[in-house]
Regions:
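Residues embedded in well-ordered secondary-structure elements
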Residues: 29, 82, 122, 136-138, ...
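Extracellular/periplasm-exposed beta-strand and loop segments of Gram-negative cell-envelope proteins
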Residues: 65-83, 106-129, 154-187, 217-242
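Mid-length scaffold segments of soluble, non-membrane domains
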Residues: 127, 139-141, 146, 152, ...
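Short glycine/proline- and aromatic-enriched beta-strand/turn motifs that initiate or cap beta-hairpins
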Residues: 37-98, 248-253, 261-262
Length: 262
């Protein structure tokens, strides 16, 4: 379920949401970098003289969305529709402080295959950023599990443009040949993950993981064309389940493999 803002406030909502997401993300990264070493000094890792867990990863998977009303409006006007399951590509970083608390940040982009329509190219995509908090569990020295909750913001973008076949005279006859529509929302993520560490436990070796959960959308804005609000737009959001494969430690693993051959 998601909610729309009032018309009086929604004209500036996508931009403010995206600015808030960026500020939240970068502020969180700075907070993690600044505070986690101090917190970790009192944790088990500090007692053992070890550095805290700190890793980055890339992720690819699928993310469900709520595009029903948007697809209905596109279909009613003769345009192609899009699958509600979009390709998700992104990455993130996390740090484990005090031995158990996981602090993370991630960015994900959502993509759908572009569609052709009467000499036009119709594209749907989006993206969002999240700051997350989780609890670190180690069933075995190489296996990690972690429930997480995150907050952030993001937006969807619908672009209708030329497919590359237009001539100069076509543009003169119809200069308004493209349009980019956007909408934004605040997001809450609830999920969990698993990660397996290859090589030395707690080292920098290859790590394979799986993350899944559900993304909730709140305070969705009206659609915008450039800087202008569009009234009467259909509901659309990134709300839905997600599942992603994560890979980390590739550079370290390749470095170890190269060193072993020398």
């Amino acid at each position: 379920m998601y909610w729309k803002t009032s018309p009086a406030r929604s004209s500036a909502c996508p931009r403010s949401l995206l600015l808030s997401a960026r500020a939240l993300l970068f502020g969180g990264l700075l907070l993690v970098a600044a505070t986690s070493p101090a917190v970790a000094q009192d944790g088990p890792a500090a007692d053992a003289g070890e550095r805290p867990e700190e890793h980055s990863y890339v992720a690819i998977g699928v993310s469900g969305t709520d595009l029903g009303p948007l697809n209905n409006r596109l279909s009613a006007n003769g345009y192609p529709t899009f699958s509600t399951e979009l390709l998700s590509i992104g990455g993130g970083a996390y740090r484990v402080v005090a031995g158990r608390i996981l602090l993370g940040a991630e960015l994900n982009g959502l993509l759908a295959p572009s569609q052709g329509f009467e000499g036009r190219d119709v594209f749907l995509g989006g993206g969002y950023g999240l700051l997350s908090l989780g609890y670190w569990i180690e069933p075995t020295p190489r296996l990690r599990a972690f429930p997480t909750a995150g907050v952030g913001a993001g937006g969807l973008l619908l672009n209708i443009g030329d497919d590359g076949s237009a001539h100069f005279d076509d543009v003169l006859a119809d200069p308004n040949r493209s349009a980019t529509l956007s909408t934004g929302s605040l997001l809450v993520s609830l999920g969990a993950g698993l990660e397996y560490q290859f090589g030395t436990p707690g080292g920098d070796g290859l790590r394979l993981g799986l993350r899944g959960g559900y993304l909730l959308s709140a305070l969705s804005s009206d659609w915008q064309l450039g800087q202008s609000r569009l009234g009467g737009g259909p509901d659309a959001s990134m709300q839905g389940p997600f599942l992603r494969l994560t890979v980390g430690g590739v550079r370290a693993a390749l470095g170890d493999a190269t060193g072993n051959k020398q």
